[in-house]
């Protein structure tokens, strides 16, 4: 029997969690396609989902709206399931500029991208786990709806080696080259192999710490063993091993040759259309670019921008959806959409933006019309492909509610007994002076305040005003990158300052138990930032503090305010009733401040590791930008390989441990 999920936690489900777990499981077992979990801030939604996954033993994909929340989810799931395959699948681009054409200025912008190798390795590891195991949780961003290599071709290209099989060395090396592995007898790194006599060492593309040694005797595989690529220490011998391609986009030679013929046919048809419309420049440009791509594909098996021919390479018809990560998920897989009120609209919006850019490229002769089929999934295609789905949000959107038939599974009662914040509505006329008074009360007892305004100008003016009156205040705006944002949140929690002012301020995501007051200025101005869901999410930022309170400044109560206040009061009444019935005294959360910084730390799965760790140096890297972290990772990798080549294995192993901590920090930062 395949391995089951083993949930590792010191806690048992409490509050509304047992009932939510029971109802979700029953719904899934009864075949419900859509369920919605309405879980308030701090109610343990992730723990509830972890229990459902563990009980049902089904491979699961969890979608998050951005890399920060994906890294946070990945870290939490790693802790809950240390013995199972918890994988991370987000965009592997540190920087990405798609090709585009601006007709007004006759400017063509070439594609420019920087790929992060470590995240590429984690993506390959995720698809391998989905193909090989049942106990898999893949935490992904919306990157999951973008085109990926066809799983059928990917499986056909795999190289299976078993002990005792008859195969000569040349055949193995030829197959490795087809999988896009490169031979490197000097620097042994991911996606390479080396040959020493009748021994072939292969460093799998999806692995970060284990390599394969193939020992041949004449034309027979005598032994297969896994070893540490750094120290050369053999970890175990295995009866069989499967080597996966170095990239998801690998294609057999015969398919490439067939694709080239199809591209030539389309090019001839498109040239006729352009010439018939007197588009001579466009016709010449298209012919030149496409012929160059065809020559590259013939010689090398790929070309720059080969993804624009993906329709032919995967054998799809015009308009058919591209293969994506969803095609790798087993038929009985489970989909969990976190912060669904944000993630679902994101999925729907990806296709149109991509389409508009590509139509311009096709119209002006930079690409063939088939390039339009290199795209993310349409929303309808996502709906058709999605397995049984659980939507998770404190404020579910209309789509989720409609799909769930209006039924939501409430998770309102927190295991800690904490109540939703008290809400007060106060007049706008005196909002700034009233806020100053409230801030001083909170600062005196070492509590923090979040203030949300409607405009950037007002946020700047308010910050300046509070500073003039001696308050320790910072302003969070859109120009601040993810890493700096995490630093600001940490400084707020540490008490470096007392007030954080923003516009669309921290609605979903990182939580701060020290915040006891949320002030919403101009709450009576209906709009995107003052909608019912925005107000509930913002009010929820004070829900982890015993003295949590929200002040809405407005001269009238708008429909959105009325709904947000009504929903918060409903939750608070239910929480109070539960606490009274069970004799629970609310307890404030004491979340460690380091928790929000060390997101997605991979567990050390290696065997025979030394006790020397590199946590102390890693602490220095917390404030570095993703680019600086990447440069540091490359520098340490180079030093590590030098130590290994000089047989200084202790120093190399110490650097390897430091690299693991650095890579985890990089995931959190990017």
Curated annotation (Swiss-Prot):
A motif (Beta-hairpin) lies at residues 92-115. Residues 26-183 form the Helicase ATP-binding domain. One of its GO terms (biological process) is SOS response. Keywords: ATP-binding, Cytoplasm, DNA damage, DNA excision, DNA repair, Excision nuclease, Helicase, Hydrolase, Nucleotide-binding, SOS response. Residues 431-597 form the Helicase C-terminal domain. It is found in: Cytoplasm. ATP binds at residues 39-46. GO terms for cellular component: cytoplasm; excinuclease repair complex. It comes from the Bacteria. GO terms for molecular function: ATP binding; ATP hydrolysis activity; DNA binding; excinuclease ABC activity; helicase activity. The beta-hairpin motif is involved in DNA binding. Forms a heterotetramer with UvrA during the search for lesions. Interacts with UvrC in an incision complex. The UvrABC repair system catalyzes the recognition and processing of DNA lesions. A damage recognition complex composed of 2 UvrA and 2 UvrB subunits scans DNA for abnormalities. Upon binding of the UvrA(2)B(2) complex to a putative damaged site, the DNA wraps around one UvrB monomer. DNA wrap is dependent on ATP binding by UvrB and probably causes local melting of the DNA helix, facilitating insertion of UvrB beta-hairpin between the DNA strands. Then UvrB probes one DNA strand for the presence of a lesion. Belongs to the UvrB family. HAMAP family: UvrB. This is UvrABC system protein B. It comes from Pectobacterium carotovorum subsp. carotovorum (strain PC1). The lineage of its organism: Bacteria, Pseudomonadati, Pseudomonadota, Gammaproteobacteria, Enterobacterales.
